[in-house]
Regions:
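Conserved hydrolase catalytic core segment
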Residues: 74-112
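Catalytic histidine-centered segment of alpha/beta-hydrolase-like enzymes
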Residues: 232-248
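Active-site loop/oxyanion-hole signature of alpha/beta-hydrolase fold enzymes
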Residues: 30-31, 37, 41-78, 249
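Conserved serine/cysteine hydrolase catalytic core
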Residues: 162-222
Length: 259
């Protein structure tokens, strides 16, 4: 979205999501004079699946690095959950590659119980769904929101397999990579990356998040003393979906103050 001559900003969704997960935020940001690159990460949405099943943090970092190196200016990166992990590791391990970071409900330390809930949801229906209504019901059960009647929006998150059933629009092999990395090992890596950050950084947390705790926020802010922080009321881990207007306003306010 927006004029390619404008400063670039890359949106990276979370694991198991697609580029459509940002609601109206990406389009709103484009109207503020930014060139928005809204990405389907490897193995998600319209992007290819990895033949070798490489959905490690290293793999996603290579992808973001390749995107940043193609742009004429260092981009701002807005990353939710897995997208935020990618952004943090990329800039922390390659200082100066990115202009600024907006991390959405992710810190080096995450809550194992919340991560387990995500993985349970992602692996719950390997056989798929008969109807889009069933998909909508599953999403509502996970998010705690009222079931959507916008089935076209739901359709963007699934594909139909050979038997005509609806399955999620991401490679199931991704779960194996997530389990293989280990939360503790990844937390050590990300905290080291955080300590290296000098780029302007905004951490956005969903107040009701079961992924990012108050302790996780405190430890991150101690490591990144210049980071700004906002706690979004009535939002869970899915901040952009739960409170899209508040989230969009926070992103726009932050990026419009960048030098």
């Amino acid at each position: 979205y927006g004029d390619p001559a404008h400063p670039p900003i890359v949106f990276l969704h979370g694991g198991g999501q697609t580029r459509h997960s940002w609601g109206d935020t990406a389009r709103k940001v484009a109207t503020e004079g930014w060139h928005v690159i809204n990405v389907d990460s490897r193995g998600h949405g319209e992007s290819d699946w990895c033949p070798d099943g490489d959905y490690t943090t290293d793999g996603f970092v290579r992808d973001l690095t390749a995107i940043a190196e193609q742009l004429k200016q260092a981009p701002v990166v807005v990353g939710a959950s897995k997208g935020g992990i990618t952004a943090l590791a990329t800039e922390g391990e390659n200082p100066g590659l990115l202009r600024s970071l907006i991390l959405v409900d992710v810190t080096p330390k995450v809550e194992a119980k919340g991560v387990s809930r995500i993985l349970d949801f992602m692996t719950a229906k390997p056989e798929g769904f008969d109807t889009l209504e069933e998909v909508a019901e599953s999403v509502a059960s996970y998010t705690g929101r009222k079931r959507t009647t916008n089935l076209e929006g739901i359709r963007k998150n699934v594909r139909q397999n050979e038997s005509g059933r609806y399955v999620w629009h991401w490679d199931p092999k991704m779960v194996n990579s997530a389990l293989g990395e280990g939360l503790d090992k990844r937390a050590i890596r990300l905290m080291e990356a955080a300590r290296n950050l000098t780029a302007p950084t905004l951490l956005v947390r969903g107040e009701k998040s079961d992924i990012v705790s108050a302790q996780g926020v405190q430890e991150f802010r101690e490591a990144v003393s210049h980071a700004e922080f906002i706690d979004v009321k009535e939002a869970s881990h899915m901040v952009a979906g739960d409170q899209n207007t508040v989230f969009s306003d926070a992103v726009i306010d932050f990026i419009n103050r960048l030098d």
